[in-house]
Amino acid sequence: MKYQLLKIIVCPVCHSKLSFDLEKKELICNVDNLAFPIRKGIPVLLKRDARNFIL
């Protein structure tokens, strides 16, 4: 994930900033507790494809 993209990309649900989980290759929204997958280098920012998580 390119740093420049991570600076501007936001959660499609609440519009808060996302963090990157390098190990799981996911974009994380800590506000909504959603993890968005990255497939073939492309972030999939669809709520239906996100998984719920609890910290």
UniProtKB/Swiss-Prot annotation:
Recorded superkingdom: Bacteria
Family annotation (Pfam families): Trm112p
GO cellular component, one term: cytosol
Residues of the signal peptide: none
InterPro entries per the UniProt record, alphabetical: Trm112-like
Family according to the record: Belongs to the UPF0434 family.
Protein name per the record: UPF0434 protein BPEN_388
